[in-house]
């Protein structure tokens, strides 16, 4: 079965870009046409890009490396967590702290602190503390969990990043590139696709589109894991014929096809410019920031 179909893309509104006046000229080769002042993305190129990204994830996972899902914009937060957890991978969906990759040794210390507090909750340590001390530790834990909960079990740097919105996740991209970590990213018509190893042209604002892209990447991880498990079984049963692995790499999502006549440019509906955050280098204040 196909990784994704044209019908899937159309139903999810993947083809809708931004208003023409907001485009990035470097996206020209991915744009099919313009209608009602909106750029329409070439879905034939999107399908090819998705297949390439899918294979990259399968290869990375089959080598025993992890995938880090990154999407901190509101539309992406829930889907990023859900799909990363579904395939057993890691995610950042609240805020990218500067140094998350390039200063991973410091991040690991914060993760150790989070696990220590969790252990204190269950081993009876809290029984010997005052209410004020307990409240302070619980507050610390909550804020660590909020920023780092999605990578709590990540022991090493990821093998590949999957990113929603390259403009918002600019720091994550810069860190990954400096470390030579491959990047898969959804690039909308207002984004710069340069420097992305596997750019996927598509709508990075619509929840349905984000869900489709993220689900496909998660399915690639699951398929690779299933194939790995099958190989183990085959090695244990060398004298028996192996069965068909038959994994469905994509579960169809039944959504309404968006009508151009009822379409409101996303720049007008929700506002395209987002407040920039100061995500410089990670420090204790960053980890406990309520943002």
Swiss-Prot record:
GO terms for biological process: translation. Residues 270-291 have a biased composition (Acidic residues). InterPro entries: Ribosomal_uS2, Ribosomal_uS2_bac/mit/plastid, Ribosomal_uS2_CS, Ribosomal_uS2_flav_dom_sf. PROSITE patterns: RIBOSOMAL_S2_1, RIBOSOMAL_S2_2. Residues 235-291 are annotated as: Disordered. One of its GO terms (cellular component) is cytosolic small ribosomal subunit. Keywords: Ribonucleoprotein, Ribosomal protein. One of its GO terms (molecular function) is structural constituent of ribosome. It comes from the Bacteria. Gene3D superfamilies: Glucose-6-phosphate isomerase like protein, domain 1, Helix hairpin bin. Belongs to the universal ribosomal protein uS2 family. This is Small ribosomal subunit protein uS2. It comes from Treponema denticola (strain ATCC 35405 / DSM 14222 / CIP 103919 / JCM 8153 / KCTC 15104).
């Amino acid at each position: 079965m196909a990784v994704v179909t044209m019908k899937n893309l159309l139903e999810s509104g993947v083809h809708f870009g931004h208003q023409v006046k907001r485009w990035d000229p470097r996206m020209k080769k991915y744009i099919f046409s313009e209608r009602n002042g909106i750029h329409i993305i070439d879905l034939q190129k999107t399908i090819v890009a998705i297949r390439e990204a899918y294979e990259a994830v399968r290869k990375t996972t089959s080598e025993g490396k992890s995938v880090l899902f990154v999407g901190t914009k509101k539309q992406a937060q829930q889907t990023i967590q859900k799909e990363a957890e579904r395939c057993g991978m890691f995610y950042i969906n609240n805020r990218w702290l500067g140094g998350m990759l390039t200063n991973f040794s410091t991040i690991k210390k914060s993760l150790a602190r989070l696990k220590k507090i969790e252990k204190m909750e269950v081993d009876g340590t809290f029984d010997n503390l005052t209410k004020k001390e307990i409240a302070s530790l619980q507050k610390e834990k909550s804020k660590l969990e909020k920023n780092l909960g999605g990578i709590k079990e990540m022991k090493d740097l990821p093998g590949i990043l999957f990113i929603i919105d390259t403009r918002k996740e600019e720091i994550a991209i810069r860190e990954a590139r400096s470390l030579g970590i491959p990047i898969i990213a959804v690039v909308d018509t207002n984004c710069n696709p340069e420097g992305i190893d596997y750019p996927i042209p598509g709508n990075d604002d619509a929840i349905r589109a984000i869900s489709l892209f993220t689900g496909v990447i998660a399915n690639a991880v699951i398929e690779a894991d299933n194939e790995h498990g099958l190989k183990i079984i085959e090695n244990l049963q060398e004298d028996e014929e192996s069965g068909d692995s038959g994994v469905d790499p994509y579960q169809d999502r039944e959504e309404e096809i968006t009508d151009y006549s009822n379409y409101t440019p996303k720049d007008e509906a929700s506002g395209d410019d987002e407040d920039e955050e100061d995500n410089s280098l990670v420090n204790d204040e960053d980890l406990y920031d309520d943002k």
